[in-house]
């Protein structure tokens, strides 16, 4: 009699979150334009491009920015695609190669109207075109904050590669600290303010900082819960569940429960900070409200995308969203050389 397949239970961390699913009405139109633009770079092999299509990163943008103007949704879609290609190119490289790639992207963002040199990795041209289009409709304050946060994200990519190189082990505290920049939430929040002009003294108020921090850590937990199955099968331990199990010497079930409980604490802290937001006058308050509502929607949009796209569960996402159960994948030896062949790093 065959043994039963082990099942993984995913806690429903978003069951009490008051912000409900919404999607941008320009989704299909903007997705077609953004994906056509991205595919024109031929950044992936056919196999890797097929995986990209299943992920449907434009769906993530449409769920994360349901009230964005058409041109700002385009920026969001392009940004999600840019995140993906940077992740795919750097995830198989050591810290030195990642450093070179990151420097190219930073230079392209700082000089969006200058042509990129021939023979350069295609990341530079993708980033240059993305930013040249984005700044046409972005407020000056949002441009500055996007660059600050996106460069911090890029630097974290190099740090993550260095961690891989030396098989670094983290505590929950140090893991969350390095993932806050690496998950890409802060530049994603900058898209929320493309049409806004929030002064620095308001934007960096402690209550505002708390909102973005708590939402970011919610995103980290939710992403790690849904990606754990695939990562445990491939031997990738850069996941908060592995960190919890190692630090507290506990089972996977206990790690899941710990992560879900911490997620609930973050939700409560977020709501408290939301209620403590001061007033700066009608004009500023309306912009702050729009921005904060956008941050609050991000965890909901990300959660919906995790099950509606094929990123984590293929065509079983809706079923998993209902049952919260997924068969535990068998472990296999991690072979990064195969992934390198799939990525096929492209130059201009």
Curated annotation (Swiss-Prot):
Enzyme class label: lyase
Residues where Mg(2+) 3 binds: 223, 227, 231
Motif (NSE/DTE motif): 223-231
Requisite cofactors: Mg(2+)
EC number assigned by the record: 4.2.3.135
Key words, A-Z: Lyase, Magnesium, Metal-binding
Site (Plays a critical role in the stabilization of intermediate cation) location in chain: 84
GO terms for MF: metal ion binding; terpene synthase activity
Gene Ontology process terms (BP): isoprenoid biosynthetic process
Domain of life: Eukaryota
Binding locations of Mg(2+) 2: 87
Chain positions of motif DDXXD motif: 87-91
Purpose: Terpene cyclase that catalyzes the cyclization of farnesyl diphosphate (FPP) to delta(6)-protoilludene.
Recorded family membership: Belongs to the terpene synthase family.
Notes concerning its domains: The conserved DDXXD and NSE/DTE motifs are important for the catalytic activity, presumably through binding to Mg(2+).
Protein name: Delta(6)-protoilludene synthase 18
């Amino acid at each position: 009699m065959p043994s039963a397949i082990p099942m993984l239970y995913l806690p429903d961390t978003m069951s009490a979150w008051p912000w409900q699913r919404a999607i941008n009405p320009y989704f299909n139109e903007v997705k077609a334009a953004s994906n056509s633009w991205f595919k024109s770079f031929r950044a992936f092999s056919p196999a890797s491009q097929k995986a990209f299509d299943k992920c449907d990163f434009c769906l993530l943008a449409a769920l994360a920015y349901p009230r964005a103007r058409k041109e700002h949704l385009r920026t969001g879609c392009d940004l999600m695609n840019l995140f993906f290609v940077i992740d795919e190119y750097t995830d198989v490289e050591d810290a030195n190669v990642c450093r070179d790639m990151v420097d190219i992207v930073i230079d392209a963002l700082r000089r969006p109207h200058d042509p990129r040199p021939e023979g350069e990795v295609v990341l530079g041209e993708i980033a240059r075109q993305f930013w040249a289009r984005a700044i046409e409709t972005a407020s000056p304050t949002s441009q500055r904050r996007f660059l600050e946060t996106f460069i911090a994200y890029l630097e974290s990519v190099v740090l993550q590669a260095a961690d891989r190189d030396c098989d670094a082990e983290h505590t929950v505290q140090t893991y969350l600290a390095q993932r806050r920049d690496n998950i890409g939430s802060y530049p994603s929040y900058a898209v929320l303010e493309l049409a806004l002009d929030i002064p620095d003294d308001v934007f960096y108020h402690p209550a505002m900082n708390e909102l973005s921090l708590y939402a970011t850590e919610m995103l980290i937990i939710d992403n790690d819960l849904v990606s754990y199955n695939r990562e445990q099968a491939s031997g990738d331990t850069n996941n908060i569940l592995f960190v919890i199990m190692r630090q507290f010497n506990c089972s996977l079930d206990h790690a899941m429960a710990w992560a879900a409980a911490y997620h609930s604490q973050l939700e409560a802290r977020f709501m408290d900070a939301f209620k403590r937001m001061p007033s700066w006058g009608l004009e500023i308050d309306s912009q702050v409200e729009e921005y904060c509502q956008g941050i609050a929607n991000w965890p909901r949009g990300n959660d919906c995308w995790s099950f509606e796209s094929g990123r984590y569960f293929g065509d079983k996402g809706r079923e998993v969203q209902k049952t919260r159960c997924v068969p535990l994948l068998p472990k296999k030896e991690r072979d990064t050389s195969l992934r390198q062949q799939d990525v096929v790093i492209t130059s201009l």
